[in-house]
Amino acid sequence: MAFAIDDKFVSIQFCEGGYDYSILGADYKLIDGGVYDNPDITIHAALNDILEDMGVSEQTERVPVDYEELMEKADTVEQAEIEANHVVSDFKAKTNEMFNDIEGQSPEDVEQTVHAHIMAKLEEYDIPVEIVDVVVSGSRCRGLEQEGSDLDVVVEYKGRESEDDLFNAFNEDGLMIGGVKVDINPITEGKTGTLATYLPGVESYLAEKQAMQKAPAVEVIPDTGGKY
């Protein structure tokens, strides 16, 4: 059985050794779950104990929902999350292969430095956002940079703060890594998108740029009107 309780969903069913339960957010993402290993009590008593651990009182309304439908939605969201993680991990793996280290610093080193920088800025300005991930992007992530190219880094976050405001906060000090200027670009799902939706566009753009760099130069012969 399953219930909608406040802004969450709770499902519970019999399993070997007790009761299997899941706590899902309003977006159907798994928050918590496991096995309640006391088969000697009823499923309703087990549910009450789980809800009590969540801080939910017995007086809180429990709206029954279809268990199978809830689990299907949760599985769909989980699969989408797995695919999104693959997009990001594959992009980072390619960057690791093609990135020209900056004074010995790898893409991972750069991402860690930028993460520490933005966390310090969030604390400085008391900005309540959650950082999802930090990814080296731009020409340097594919070894296509020119002399003087910035080091582009994209940061996905969750929160109400605007992308423009975070951009200003993250870049106001002019972060430099190995003498290279870092350009930090915050994105969020409600505007520019997630990393999973944003990075494929970056990949396509850089592939076109690489193809243009490899294309042979075409010699233009001026029109002399037949006179030599």
Where are the language model's segments positioned?
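Short, isolated positions in well-ordered beta-strands
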Residues: 10-11, 31, 182-184
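Short N-terminal "domain-start" leader segments
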Residues: 1-20
